[in-house]
Regions:
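Short histidine/acidic/glycine/proline-rich micro-motifs that form metal-
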Residues: 130-132, 265-266
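Alpha-helical coupling/stalk and coiled-coil linker elements that connect catalytic or binding modules
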Residues: 122-131, 145-146, 161-168, 175-177
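ABC ATP-binding cassette signature C-motif
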Residues: 1-112, 163-434
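ABC transporter TMD-NBD coupling linker
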Residues: 140-161, 203
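An intracellular "coupling" helix at the cytosolic face of ABC transporter transmembrane type-1 domains
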Residues: 97, 107, 118, 136, ...
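Transmembrane helical bundles of ABC transporters
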Residues: 5, 136-139
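Alpha-helical coiled-coil heptad-repeat register
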Residues: 109, 116, 120-123, 127, ...
């Protein structure tokens, strides 16, 4: 169910496949306590659903880290929140946690505002100097010193990534037009007789099992691969940008700064020159991290660097291949908001069901043997349409079967027995028999 190649050497597997092997080892061990760190990364949707169902039946205790909101909603019965060095346990579902956390932050904000107001008033009092000393209110001075210490120790909420797209010229009305496309790799058919039209402003998701050819389809649609049959035409005035799930466009030996811009201290954002350090701070990189080699970064930091570099460019057609891998929840939600507001066209490959549901207008689904179909809406909409289609097909099949059977003559119904009254029976016995 994890789509693992049984005979492959572990050392020859990709990072994603190695994660799957380790996940499989953890599951078959049947431990009392199972610890999972981002288990849905690099899994396809089918595998994630299977994992959810498996873990729902798991008899032991489960402690997991995840940014996958659908996964959290399905499994979590308690949320442990690490915020500014403090662990807080929130009983209940993920949805209840979100509500309670928001309420706590609002209370904290009100408390901090009152605290800061009091501190400001006390600072005014102490600056009065001679007047303050004359009062000889040493207790008030000590209280002020404690207020200063408390303010110094306060840890503010971490800043949020600032995502802004560059202004770009509108593309032509038709972005992609594909007619009867076929592409085969060795003995495997990726797409067969695939016809598809994408219009300006549409946001289209792509889902399917791992290895089905989602990335290959993107390369076909972008003109990086030529179809073996059929034709693909790209629209006019397209400025395309590609977010690569493998992060192959990053130079691991170079620093964060040099991966963003070389031989320059500034980037241009919507016509405004901005210093590299200031720009990277918008993506939560400290000055220390900015000069570190990319190979020392975490997966989430590399993703943020790719986003930082992506948004230095202008584009009206954005292609994103698994952008949510390793992203923290805040950045993921900000990216989601940006894509919803994006005025251009979007092609999105993702295993994150919530992310797809919240961003796309229709979805291309790999359904086996090179068949790729388009459905209105996101993942949940596809499930609903698929269920309706299956029910309709079953209804049609049952009608066909009933019509194919010869009609049988109805069995004669026995006549109902008439019960006579005692007087009638007596009269009947008096009738002479001839």
């Amino acid at each position: 169910r994890l789509n693992l190649p049984a005979d492959a050497e572990f050392n020859q597997l990709s990072g994603g496949m190695k994660r799957r092997v380790l996940l499989g080892m953890a599951l078959v061990a049947e431990p009392d306590l199972l610890l999972l760190d981002e288990p849905t990364n690099h899994l396809d949707i089918e595998s994630i659903i299977w994992l959810e169902e498996f873990l729902q039946q798991f008899k032991g205790s489960l402690l997991f880290i995840s940014h996958d909101r659908s996964f959290l909603k399905s499994l979590a019965t308690r949320i442990i929140d690490l915020d500014r060095g403090k662990l807080t346990s929130w009983p209940g579902s993920y949805e209840r946690y979100l509500e309670a956390k928001q309420a706590q932050l609002e209370v904290e904000s009100t408390h901090n505002a009152l605290f800061d107001k009091k501190l400001a008033l006390e600072e005014v009092w102490i600056r009065q100097g001679i007047k303050a000393r004359r009062t000889r209110n040493e207790g008030r001075v000590r209280a002020l010193e404690q207020l200063r210490r408390d303010r110094s120790d306060r840890r503010e909420l971490q800043g949020r990534v600032k995502l802004v797209t560059q202004k770009s010229e509108k593309s032509g009305k038709i972005v992609i037009n594909a007619e009867a496309v076929k592409f085969q790799f060795e003995d495997k058919t990726i797409v067969n007789n695939f016809t598809f039209k994408m219009l300006r402003g549409e946001k289209i998701g792509i889902i399917g099992p791992n290895g089905c050819g989602k990335s290959t389809l993107i390369k076909l649609l972008l003109g990086k691969l030529a179809p073996q049959e059929g034709d693909i035409q790209l629209g006019t005035k397209l400025e395309a940008a590609y977010f690569d799930q493998h992060r192959e466009t990053l130079d691991l030996e170079k620093s964060v700064r040099d991966n963003l811009v070389e031989k320059s201290d500034h980037v241009e954002v919507n016509g405004v020159s901005k210093h590299v350090i200031s720009y990277l701070k918008d993506f939560l990189f400290s000055e220390k991290k900015i000069n570190m080699p990319v190979k020392a970064l975490s997966g989430g930091e590399r993703n943020r660097l790719l986003l930082a570099r992506l948004f230095t460019r202008s584009f009206n057609f954005l292609v994103m291949d698994e952008p949510t891998n390793d992203l923290d929840m805040d950045t993921l939600e900000l990216l989601e908001e940006l894509l919803v507001d994006f005025k251009g066209s979007l092609l999105l490959v993702s295993h994150d069901r919530n992310f797809i549901d919240n961003t796309v207008t229709s979805t291309l689904v790999f359904e086996g043997d090179g068949e790729v179909n388009e459905y209105v809406g996101g993942y949940v909409d596809w499930l609903r349409q698929r269920t309706t289609t299956n029910e309709s097909a079953q209804a049609i099949n049952s009608k066909v079967k009933s019509k194919s059977k010869p009609a049988q003559a109805p069995k004669p119904q026995p006549k109902p027995k008439v019960k006579l009254s005692a007087a009638d029976e007596k009269d009947l016995r008096l009738i002479p028999i001839k």
